Amino acid sequence: MSMTLHFALDPELTPELRAEIVTLWTDATNAGGAVGFVPPATEDRVWPTARKQFAGIGKEGDPGADRLLIARSGDVLAGVLFFESMRFDLMDHWRLLKRVMVAPSLQGRGYGVELMAEAERIGRDWGLAGLRLTARGGMGLEKFYGRCGYTEVGRVPGAIRVAPGDERDDITFWRDLRPQA
């Protein structure tokens, strides 16, 4: 039986939480997750990218700022994702989900689906028209995101080079949040 997830939108980004996120990010990468790096990854390698991601986070009501959603199972950081703003008025009606991660030790419990459902609930509460995300091809993520209600809307062949001679498609998914008539 799995523990209930508890979500927090815009938690205080303390040094401790930053470190927890970097540890989760490193662990997710080393478990084969496609979150910006390839294994073997170290926290020292992840920190510079994490600092840039953290720098975009604003406070509630801060227009154009990125937002952070975390999930905890008890005291353990179970999942993370970022709502990234395009910082462009003509695209302010949707957000890009970035760094969607679940702790490898907690995978297989439905936490990824719960994290995506909470992101959708928040997006609807904000009145967004949709949520977009990108994924690395060759990882089997199409099936997971399809179960979460996302539709593949584009693919750039070979756009992600994970190693010399190993290029993967950059896949774009969309979750339409507009009310259906």
Language-model region placement:
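Active-site acidic-Proline motif in GNAT/NAT acetyltransferases
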Residues: A103-R109
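Terminal substrate-recognition subdomain of acyl/acetyltransferases
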Residues: S2-M3, D10-L13, T151, V162-A181
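Active-site-proximal loop/turn and secondary-structure-junction residues that shape catalytic pockets
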Residues: M101, G137-M139
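Conserved GNAT acetyl-CoA-binding A-motif
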Residues: M116, G123-R136
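Conserved catalytic-core motifs of GNAT/GCN5-like acyltransferases
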Residues: R132-R136, G146, T151-D169
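Residues forming the Rossmann-fold NAD(P)(H) cofactor-binding site
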Residues: V113
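Acetyl-CoA-dependent GNAT
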Residues: F7-R99, A103, M116-E118, I122, ...
